[in-house]
C-alpha cells in the first residue's frame, strides 16, 4: 500500500480508502453484516487506513456496522471519516447532538476526519448562519474531531467559495477521467491542493459505471492497449496519477475487487502513467463523449441561469443516464442534486426558455430545447419523490430530538 501525506498535519493516509456506502447484501436485501466486517478487515489488513461513512448511508446502519468492524484492535489502525448532514441541522444544538451520537454509534471517542456532507451554495450559507465554524473550532479543540472538511458536488465557483471561507484541513470531491471539467473538476482539485488541503476523491469509477459492463466501443479501446488492465484499474490509476490527490475512495463489496484494488494501490505512483497510457485513457474518454446525448463540456459559459437551472450539472446527469441505462441510481442522483432535496432546486424543469444560455454556449448547443428533453427524461417522478424524501429526513431529525428528550440528555442545551 502506498501512502500520501495530509499537508497541514502530516498524517499519512493510504491512497485507497474504503467507502462504506455499498456494503454487500443478503439474498433478502439486507446488509450481510458478517461479510461486511470481514471485507473491512480484509482491506485494513491490506494497508487501508481511511474509512469513509455517513449517517445516511444504509439508512443509518453504515456507521453502526463500521463501529463493530473496528473492534478487536482495528480502531487503532485506521482513521474514521464521517459526516454532519446539513439537512438535519437547524441549530447549534443539533450539531452537538449529531456528533455525540456518531461517536457513540462508532464506538470511539473521536472522529479523525469530519465533513459537512454534500454542501450546496444554499446549505453552506445556512450552516454559516447557524455557527458551523465555531462548532468545528470547538469540536477540534475538545478533541472530538481531528480534521475538519467538507464534501460537495457543487460547481467550481461554489467550491472555491467554500474553500476560501474557512481553514479547512481537507475536502472531498467527485473526480474521474470523465469529470475533469464537471463539478469542482481539475481546477478545483489543484485549487484546494494549492491551499494545502488534502483532497479525497469520491466516484473514481462513477458509481461503478467506468468498470464492469462498459460500452462495447470502450472495451475495444482497453482491449487494444499495449498494457492489459481492467477498466477499473485504468480509471483508478488515472486519478492516482494526480499528485494533488490524497485518498481515492472505493465502495468495495466484493473480496476479489478488494484484492484487485489493493494490488493496484501498491504501485500507483503520482505521475506514474506513461504517455501511451494517458493516450489510451483519452481515447476512451473521447469515445464516451461521442456516445453522450449532449456535447456539453461543462465550461460554464451558460451560467448563471436567470431561472436557477444548473445547466452543466443537468446535462452531466442526463448524459450519465444515457450512457449507463442499466444503472437505476442515475435518476435518484439527479433528484438529489437538482430536485431541491439537499439545497435549492436547480432542475431542467425550471427553464423559462429565455435563450440567454444558447447565445453564450461555445458549442452552439440548443440548450432551451435540450432542457425540455432533460426534464422529460429525468423528472417524471420528482414531484412525488422529493416531498417523500424530505419528509423522511424531517422524521429522522425529529426522532433524534424526541429520543434526546426522552433520555433527558440536555448536555448541549
Regions found by a protein language model. Give the residues of each.
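Short catalytic-loop micro-motif centered on adjacent basic/acidic residues
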Residues: 50-56, 146-150, 172-173, 247-249, ...
Amino acid at each position: 500500500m502506498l501512502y500520501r501525506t495530509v499537508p497541514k498535519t502530516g498524517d499519512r493516509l493510504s491512497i485507497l480508502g474504503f467507502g462504506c456506502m455499498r456494503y454487500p447484501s443478503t439474498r433478502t436485501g439486507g446488509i450481510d453484516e458478517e461479510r461486511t466486517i470481514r471485507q473491512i478487515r480484509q482491506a485494513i489488513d491490506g494497508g487501508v487506513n481511511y474509512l469513509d461513512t455517513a449517517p445516511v448511508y444504509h439508512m443509518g446502519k453504515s456507521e453502526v456496522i463500521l463501529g463493530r468492524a473496528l473492534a478487536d484492535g482495528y480502531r487503532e489502525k485506521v482513521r474514521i471519516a464521517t459526516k454532519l448532514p446539513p439537512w438535519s441541522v437547524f441549530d447549534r444544538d443539533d450539531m452537538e447532538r449529531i456528533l455525540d451520537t456518531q461517536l457513540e454509534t462508532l464506538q470511539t471517542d473521536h472522529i479523525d476526519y469530519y465533513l459537512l456532507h454534500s454542501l450546496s451554495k444554499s446549505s453552506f450559507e445556512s450552516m454559516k448562519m447557524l455557527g458551523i465554524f465555531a462548532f468545528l473550532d470547538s469540536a477540534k479543540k475538545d478533541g472530538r474531531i481531528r480534521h475538519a472538511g467538507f464534501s460537495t458536488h457543487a460547481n467550481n465557483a461554489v467550491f472555491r467559495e467554500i474553500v476560501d471561507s474557512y481553514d479547512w484541513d481537507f475536502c472531498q470531491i467527485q473526480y474521474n477521467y470523465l469529470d475533469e471539467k464537471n463539478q469542482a473538476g481539475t481546477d478545483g482539485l489543484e485549487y484546494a491542493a494549492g491551499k494545502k488541503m488534502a483532497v479525497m476523491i469520491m466516484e473514481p469509477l462513477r458509481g461503478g459505471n467506468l468498470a464492469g459492463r462498459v460500452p462495447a466501443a470502450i472495451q475495444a479501446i482497453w482491449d487494444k492497449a499495449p498494457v492489459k488492465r481492467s477498466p477499473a484499474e485504468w480509471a483508478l490509476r488515472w486519478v492516482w496519477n494526480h499528485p494533488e490527490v490524497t485518498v481515492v475512495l472505493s465502495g468495495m463489496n466484493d473480496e476479489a475487487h478488494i484484492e484487485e484494488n489493493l494490488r493496484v494501490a501498491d504501485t500507483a505512483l503520482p505521475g506514474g502513467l506513461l504517455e501511451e497510457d494517458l493516450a489510451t485513457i483519452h481515447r476512451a474518454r473521447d469515445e464516451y463523449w461521442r456516445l453522450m446525448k449532449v456535447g456539453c463540456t461543462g465550461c460554464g459559459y451558460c451560467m448563471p441561469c436567470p431561472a436557477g437551472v444548473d445547466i452543466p450539472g443537468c446535462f452531466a446527469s442526463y448524459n450519465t443516464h444515457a450512457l449507463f441505462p442499466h444503472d437505476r441510481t442515475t435518476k435518484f442522483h439527479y433528484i438529489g442534486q437538482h430536485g431541491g432535496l439537499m439545497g435549492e432546486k436547480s432542475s431542467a424543469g425550471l427553464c423559462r426558455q429565455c435563450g440567454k444560455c444558447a447565445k453564450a454556449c461555445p458549442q452552439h448547443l440548443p440548450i432551451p430545447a435540450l432542457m425540455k428533453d432533460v426534464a422529460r427524461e429525468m423528472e417524471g417522478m420528482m414531484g412525488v419523490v422529493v416531498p417523500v424524501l424530505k419528509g423522511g429526513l424531517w422524521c429522522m431529525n425529529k426522532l433524534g430530538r424526541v429520543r434526546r428528550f426522552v433520555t433527558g440528555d440536555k448536555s448541549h442545551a
